[in-house]
Curated annotation (Swiss-Prot):
Principal cellular location given in the protein's record: membrane
Catalysed conversion reaction: ATP + H2O + 4 H(+)(in) = ADP + phosphate + 5 H(+)(out)
Short name of any one Pfam family annotated for the protein: ATP-synt_ab
InterPro entries found in the cross-reference section: AAA+_ATPase, ATP-synt_VA_C, ATP_synth_F1_bsu, ATPase_alpha/beta_chains, ATPase_F1/V1/A1_a/bsu_N, ATPase_F1/V1/A1_a/bsu_N_sf, ATPase_F1/V1/A1_a/bsu_nucl-bd, ATPase_F1/V1_b/a_C
The protein's name: ATP synthase subunit beta
GO CC term, one of those recorded: plasma membrane
Quaternary data: F-type ATPases have 2 components, CF(1) - the catalytic core - and CF(0) - the membrane proton channel. CF(1) has five subunits: alpha(3), beta(3), gamma(1), delta(1), epsilon(1). CF(0) has three main subunits: a(1), b(2) and c(9-12). The alpha and beta chains form an alternating ring which encloses part of the gamma chain. CF(1) is attached to CF(0) by a central stalk formed by the gamma and epsilon chains, while a peripheral stalk is formed by the delta and b chains.
Residues noted as binding ATP in the record, renumbered to the chain: G173, G174, A175, G176, V177, G178, K179, T180
GO MF term (any one): ATP hydrolysis activity
Organism in which the protein naturally occurs: Bifidobacterium longum subsp. infantis (strain ATCC 15697 / DSM 20088 / JCM 1222 / NCTC 11817 / S12)
Length: 490
């Protein structure tokens, strides 16, 4: 594995001996075999270039994956190999793929090799430092041993599925339930309340979605606080496999050199596993369970172990997870779950009620929802809220049959409190202000716990359900109820 800085060896040239799709065999002089993970460069002549201004030559990067004997390496191409022929000259760069790091990455979109994709024609960008994407995780004695909660100011997350500083969070949800808005809001809050930056890795998803995300982030004003790296579904499997490492390397620089708290988004972590399976098959490895690569756990671990808190600052990761055929025992999601500290599940049913963020409070989990980490008051409040919501869920079938009036007084009270809790779990977002016209709100965790404890204790039993909708903390609730009373009096 490479360290922060890697000195390039004397360049050595080889020649292509075999081309099979994106797998390339290259022969080098004996004694000059490139190291595993070294980046090789080869130029393809584009014989089909007929339009004026169309590139006549294309340089592609190969990454060394295997040594075959004393003089041949097997590589994976990061770009299409159309036009590559046997005998083509290949140069060894002497170092792994290296990417720009530092402030130059903010507000820019990169490919896996660190090339800027959204550079303006008149823009001059100076890259002063590059880091290799293959790096060791922090040493054991550099890790932060204390488990801390990462306060987001979002009530439903802080109360029921608290995030771990330097932890890994799985984000589940279908199309249209608010994943993108939640991602944008987290980027905004990290910059605003934690003074940190965000890095986004788009792995194997639709190019249109990536383009929409960039446009929406620019509109929301969070693009300048974010570095984005994309390897979408039309890219080579080698590219999709390395994009998370490129993004993570940029995040590590912010953490280790600039001492910032970083939020790393990976969308979608399943596509990373899928790309690893494709590369493994191309390299001729024997498949393992359900056709996945035999080194699935090792590949996942090499990525996830680098996402952590050091004694300086942290990288907190939010990873969108696709579960194939909703089978949670599939090796890909099952391997990912072993690394997660919390799961946030977005529900279409909750979104259909107009409650955002549409986090399912009963399905979402966190390993630090424990008195040892969040305190007894937080733990007790979360359990009481979940118990009320669970009882309300059980009563829905009965209510559908006989109506709410036939319930016992205790169950009626539970249902009324549950409805208020559901509404109060919603919250206005800063990035949605221009669409909703309602200002965003940040609610400290202590205030969240106090507010929900009061609801569970029945302090607000006389306050109508409508007063709990679209507000932030206790002060907002009491102000809205006061205004409603004035309107009713008028």
């Amino acid at each position: 594995m490479a360290d922060n800085q890697t000195t390039a060896a004397e360049p050595t040239n080889g020649r292509v001996t075999r081309v099979q799709g994106s797998v390339i065999d290259v022969e080098f002089p004996v004694g000059h075999l490139p190291d595993i993970y070294n980046a090789l460069k080869v130029t393809i002549v584009n014989t089909g270039a007929k339009e004026e201004g169309e590139a006549k030559e294309t340089e592609i990067t190969l990454e060394v994956e295997q040594h075959l004997g004393d003089s041949t390496v097997r590589c994976v191409a990061l770009k299409p190999t159309d036009g590559l022929v046997r005998g083509a000259s290949v140069s060894d760069t002497g170092v792994p793929i290296s990417v720009p790091v530092g402030d130059v990455t903010k507000g820019h979109v990169f490919d896996v090799s660190g090339n800027i994709l959204n550079k303006k024609p008149d823009e001059t960008i100076t890259v002063s430092e590059r880091w290799p994407i293959h790096r060791n995780p922090p040493a054991f004695d550099q890790l932060e041993s204390k488990t801390q909660m990462f306060e987001t100011g979002i009530k439903v997350i802080d109360l029921l599925t608290p995030y771990v500083q330097g932890g890994k969070i799985g984000l589940f949800g279908g199309a249209g339930v608010g994943k993108t808005v939640l991602i944008q809001e987290m980027i905004q809050r990290v910059a605003q309340n934690h003074g940190g930056v965000s890095v986004f890795a788009g792995v194997g998803e639709r190019t249109r979605e990536g383009n929409d995300l960039i446009g929406e982030m620019a509109e929301a004003g969070v693009l300048e606080k974010t570095a984005l790296v994309f390897g979408q579904m039309d890219e080579q499997p080698g590219t999709r496999l390395r994009v998370p490492l490129t993004a993570l390397t940029m995040a590590e620089y912010f953490r280790d050199v600039q001492n910032q708290d970083v939020l790393l988004f990976i969308d979608n972590i399943f596509r990373f596993t899928q790309a690893g399976s494709e590369v493994s098959t191309l390299l001729g490895r024997m498949p393992s369970a359900v056709g996945y690569q035999p080194n699935l756990a090792d590949e996942m671990g090499s990525l996830q172990e680098r996402i952590t808190s050091t004694r300086g600052h942290s990288i907190t990761s939010l990873q969108a997870i696709y579960v194939p055929a909703d089978d949670y025992t599939d090796p890909a999601p099952a391997t990912t779950f072993a690394h997660l500290d919390a799961t946030t599940e977005l529900s279409r049913d909750i979104a259909s009620k107009g409650i955002y963020p549409a986090v399912d409070p009963l399905s979402s989990t966190s390993r630090i929802l424990d008195p040892r980490y969040v305190g007894q008051a937080h733990y007790d409040c979360a359990n009481r809220v979940k118990a009320i919501l669970q009882r309300n869920k059980e009563l829905q079938d009965i209510i559908a049959l006989i109506g709410i009036d036939e319930l016992s007084e205790e169950d009626k009270t539970t249902v009324n409190r549950a409805r208020k809790i559901e509404q109060f779990l919603g919250q206005n977002f800063y990035v949605a202000e221009k669409f909703t016209g309602r200002p965003g709100s940040y609610v400290p965790a202590d205030e969240t716990i106090e507010a929900f404890t009061r609801i569970c204790d029945g302090v607000y039993d006389d306050v109508p359900e409508q007063a709990f909708s679209g507000i932030g903390g206790i002060d907002d609730l009491e102000e809205k109820w006061h205004n409603m009373q004035k309107e009713l009096g008028a």
